[in-house]
């Protein structure tokens, strides 16, 4: 009965099976062979179970990929590669130079990275749980202009799956208007690794958001924020922000360094005020 049912199903879906490629055909063939073998009363080998599970996992991955266009898959890959690059920079503890240290312990470090340029690293502790920061920085991202004076506006242009988005950010003038208005188009990727949340991004091209008149299109390099519960105090959060920006235009390096370093210090202060004054939503990282 089982064998007959399989043959009937296989016959009715023959045209569909013909359109399958690679692993899909192999999976169908393996299932057919196993059903035939079971009809003869043989035992189920562990090796076959392993192969079906493996093929099923690969097939699931292929089916998930098929939900996205080639361009969307390219954005996903670009975001994940930016995350790996940024985490690799943070992992290397050698060569960091102290830019500033605040009374509350907030610290900005810098380092020159080959093929990237000068990057800045903010290290702070926030007296809020990690979920609250995740909520504000990810789920309420488009509201950042309400509390961060460095940002005029952030818009999510496209969501791709559950981890990847394309954003447009309009930055405010800085350094007494010496640094004019800039905007950024970025691909951002959000992942959780155990108790750690990583929010990463980098500059990208997006046809629906061409360069704006009167605004310089700047670029984020591999950038990320890492959130994790403070060791021994899970209601507090250790935030590490790696900032890499090419502001474009002609600007003295001394001004660029001062602006980026101060931007990180100001961000930490404004974030704390926002978290204290704005009620939390039900968010989980």
UniProtKB/Swiss-Prot annotation:
Q: START domain location, by residue?
A: 67-280
| Locations listed in the record | Mitochondrion
Keywords (alphabetical) are: Lipid transport, Lipid-binding, Mitochondrion, Phosphoprotein, Steroidogenesis, Transit peptide, Transport
Keyword Translocase listed = no
Listed GO MF terms: cholesterol binding; cholesterol transfer activity
Which organism is this entry from? Ovis aries (Sheep)
- According to its UniProt record, where is this protein mainly located? mitochondrion
* PROSITE patterns xref list: START
Query: Sorted alphabetically, which InterPro entries does this protein's record hold?
Result: StAR (IPR029866), StAR-like (IPR000799), START-like_dom_sf (IPR023393), START_lipid-bd_dom (IPR002913)
Q: Which gene encodes it?
A: STAR
Pathway info: Steroid metabolism; cholesterol metabolism
Q: Which residues carry this modification: Phosphoserine?
A: 57, 195
PANTHER family listed in its UniProt record: STEROIDOGENIC ACUTE REGULATORY PROTEIN, MITOCHONDRIAL
The stretch annotated as transit peptide is 1-63
Q: Name one GO biological process term.
A: steroid biosynthetic process
Q: What is this protein called?
A: Steroidogenic acute regulatory protein, mitochondrial
What catalytic activity is recorded?
cholesterol(in) = cholesterol(out)
Which cellular component appears as one GO term in the record?
A: mitochondrion
